[in-house]
Regions:
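Active-site-adjacent structural elements that line small-molecule/cofactor binding pockets in enzymes
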Residues: 1-316
Length: 316
């Protein structure tokens, strides 16, 4: 198992100095991935339900501060040497598909082949409407098409795609990514996401803290991973070739956080407890663990990074 840091696009990483410091230190400490989230605007009023909080509210919905995901990945590419750059996750319908493919390929070239695309279909209908995305109700089908178009553009000498949401032919798309094709990890925890991961993903990359589809135990994660692999088999694919990551936000190394029943929340507690959680997911099939401990204070974020890399990772 290797490890990554989800930086987000706000807080301590929401400015040049903070993003540079955290990205470079994660690189120096030998972490494998830097993750960046994807929002462009928030509307002042919204009926959409954020899937990763019990009350359905996004933590920044009131003020909406967020840097652009792909711009942050480009910046991080310029100030790091080895760490991979992960869209964690990209809301696939947010941007026009050919432009998105070009931006990701360009970052891959400028980083010498360090891009991994985490891909999701999104949850904030009002944001998609502002951006002119395909209708919210067809975001899954549109995302599937966009992904097929990305791969055509990245790998084919004369790329073409004809579909309900993406149409192009007779185009020259250069440069191609440095990698044969940019790996695409499908995000999401529900049945549709598991099906998408198994059938068209290069990997699966769920979050553990989804109240509707919780993966906050290694056993729950293992059961859902088995479902992803079944979907791969049904699609005629080798299920063991799928890459498997997991995103554990809310990391606390120190006093454990307790849920309403008094049970310790996963990935909180002593270094040994957090490492034990990580080993559980590793044994269940996860190859990559990305943790999140966003802070508004740079010194605090750097301290948390040091503790995780030096006190937890060696125990896994």
């Amino acid at each position: 198992m290797d490890f990554g840091l989800h930086l987000g696009t706000r807080g301590a990483a929401g400015n040049a100095d903070g993003l540079r410091a955290l990205a470079q230190r994660a690189d120096q400490l030998g972490l494998a991935y830097l993750g960046f989230s994807d929002h462009i605007v928030f509307t002042r009023e919204s009926s959409s339900q954020y899937p990763y909080s019990p009350d359905g509210k996004h933590p920044v919905q009131g003020h909406g501060f967020c840097l652009d995901q792909l711009t942050c990945m480009t910046f991080a590419a310029a100030v790091t040497k080895s760490i991979r750059l992960l869209s964690s996750v990209m809301v696939v319908p947010h941007r026009p598909p050919v432009l998105t493919a070009k931006m990701l390929a360009s970052i891959d070239v400028l980083s010498n082949g360090r891009v991994t695309m985490g891909a999701g279909v999104g949850w904030l209908a009002e944001e998609m409407a502002v951006l002119g995305s395909p209708p919210y109700e067809v975001r899954g089908a549109a995302s599937n098409e966009y992904i097929a178009a990305f791969r055509a553009l990245w790998t084919q000498a004369s790329p073409a795609h004809q579909g309900a949401h993406v149409n192009f032919r007779d185009v020259v798309f250069e440069p191609k990514p440095v990698q044969t094709s940019i790996p695409i990890w499908i995000g999401g925890e529900g049945k549709a996401a598991r099906r998408r991961a198994g059938r068209i993903g290069d990997g699966w990359y769920p979050m553990i803290r989804n109240p509707k589809d919780p993966l906050d135990t290694a056993a729950a994660f293992a059961a859902s991973l088995a479902d992803v692999r079944r979907e791969a088999e049904l699609a005629g694919r080798d299920p063991m070739r799928l890459d498997v990551g997991v995103f554990a936000g809310g990391l606390v190394v120190g006093a454990p956080v307790l849920d309403r029943s008094g049970k310790r929340v996963a990935f909180t507690g002593s270094p040994a407890q957090v490492a034990d959680d990580a080993r559980g997911y590793k044994d269940a099939g996860a190859k990559h663990l990305v943790v999140g401990f966003e802070s508004n204070v740079l010194s605090e974020a750097l301290d948390r990074l040091e503790v995780f890399a030096k006190e937890v990772v060696p125990l896994v």
